[in-house]
């Protein structure tokens, strides 16, 4: 069952439960008071409520749902004599995406054998380690904690510039909110990422949530940094809204390539490191950038530079429509090396050869040889091993009385 069908089934079942539960709740006199969820980001969410009923309560469970991942868990609760309950969700062990919506409800089993399902409640898993300031424009929300009002306005300007840049590649979808969170240091941002993230990570997006997180330190370079990093992450959100839940099937080189093209002020070192790698025959094969980028900072930067240049080549050759068609094929599950064949009628390896030749001025023979090198090695093995056998047999045939060589044991 695919993700869309699973989510729809989940919604239908949940709606059915709530409708039936409201009728049962009214009949049984179950009441919930002081329902709260206290978030301690990176540590826990504490769910508390006081539950009372006209019929004695046999047991209570809490149903917690992570909407962004369509995951749920059902946990039994202890009910105190005064009806109080609490449950601590350890967010160090249970992975929650930053700023995701968490919903919860209560299932109350009564002594008469009936079960009552409460209404659902919701809390946002906000990074409350900081006191956020907020500036809004329509569905665009900019949040920061280090810097004055001018800093926030500069960030909002960067969002709008980034959307204008993105609109040259695809239609914008601003129907749902976009929340941009600006962190003052890489360490602060890494505190939001599941595994801490690499040291060089300066931005992250949760496209399904419409959440963008970037590192920008207040100072003379803040506007340039904003117009590099914010548009980059915004493109991830727009691409997700364009292709839907198949977004994660898109190769890393195309996701990051389109994101770097959206940067208003792209990093000037992209071209330098790309030219150096091309001259030294140190380019990363594009097929090696399908699943993910390298963890090493230097190699990762080269991966970004290559992806930007290769994606720009595709855009210049096939236009925005061609690029979006390619993304759509990938989102539908087409394999990395087959997607370009479906969209353009050309293999990924041949497109790479053309890109290296026309954009980087590299001899087309080198990448072609690199692509077929494993097959050449295999061919040599297939030919050489029988040849060695034939030579050995002819030598033995020419000297029939010569004894075989052996090593005497001492």
Residue locations for each model-derived region?
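Acidic/His/Gly-enriched intrinsically disordered linker/tail segments
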Residues: 199-212, 224-229, 234-237, 241-372, ...
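Glycan-association/targeting regions that enable binding to alpha-glucans and other polysaccharides
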Residues: 24-131
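C-terminal single-pass membrane-anchor helix
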Residues: 364-409
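Bacterial N-terminal signal peptides
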Residues: 10-18
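Juxtacatalytic substrate-recognition/specificity segment
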Residues: 131-247, 251, 292-293, 335-339
């Amino acid at each position: 069952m695919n993700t869309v069908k699973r989510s729809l089934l989940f919604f239908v079942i949940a709606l059915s439960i709530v409708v039936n539960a409201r009728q049962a709740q009214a009949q049984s006199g179950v009441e919930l008071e002081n329902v709260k969820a206290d978030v301690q980001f990176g540590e826990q969410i504490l769910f508390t409520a006081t539950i009372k009923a006209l019929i004695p309560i046999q047991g209570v469970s809490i149903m917690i749902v992570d909407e962004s991942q369509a995951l749920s868990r059902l946990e039994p609760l202890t009910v105190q004599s005064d009806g109080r309950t609490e449950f601590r969700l350890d967010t160090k062990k249970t992975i929650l995406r930053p700023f995701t919506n968490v919903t919860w409800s209560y299932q109350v089993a009564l002594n008469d054998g009936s079960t009552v399902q409460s209404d659902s409640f919701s809390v946002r898993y906000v990074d409350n380690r900081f006191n956020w300031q907020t500036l809004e424009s329509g569905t665009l929300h900019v949040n920061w904690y280090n810097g004055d009002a001018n800093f926030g306005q500069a960030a909002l300007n960067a969002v709008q510039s980034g959307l204008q840049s993105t609109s040259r590649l695809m239609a914008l979808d601003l129907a749902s909110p976009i929340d941009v969170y600006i962190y003052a240091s890489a360490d602060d941002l890494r505190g939001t990422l599941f595994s801490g993230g690499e040291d060089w990570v300066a931005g992250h997006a949760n496209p399904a949530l419409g959440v963008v997180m970037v590192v920008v330190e207040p100072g003379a370079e803040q506007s340039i940094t904003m117009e590099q990093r914010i548009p980059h992450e915004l493109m991830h959100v727009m691409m997700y809204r364009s292709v839907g839940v198949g977004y994660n099937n898109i190769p890393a080189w195309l996701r990051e390539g389109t994101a770097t093209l959206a940067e208003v002020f792209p990093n000037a070192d992209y071209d330098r490191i790309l030219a150096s790698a091309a001259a030294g025959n140190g380019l990363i094969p594009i097929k090696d950038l399908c699943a993910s980028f390298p963890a090493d900072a230097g190699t990762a930067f080269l991966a970004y530079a290559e992806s930007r240049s290769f994606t720009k080549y595709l855009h210049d050759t096939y236009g925005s429509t061609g690029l979006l068609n390619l993304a759509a094929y990938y989102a539908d599950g087409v394999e990395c090396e087959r997607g370009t064949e479906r969209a353009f009628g050309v293999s990924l390896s041949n497109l790479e050869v053309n890109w290296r030749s026309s954009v980087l001025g590299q001899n087309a023979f080198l990448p072609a040889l690199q692509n077929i090198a494993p097959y050449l090695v295999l061919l040599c093995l297939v030919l050489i091993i029988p040849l060695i056998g034939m030579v050995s047999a002819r030598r033995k045939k020419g000297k029939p009385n010569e004894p075989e060589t052996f090593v005497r044991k001492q």
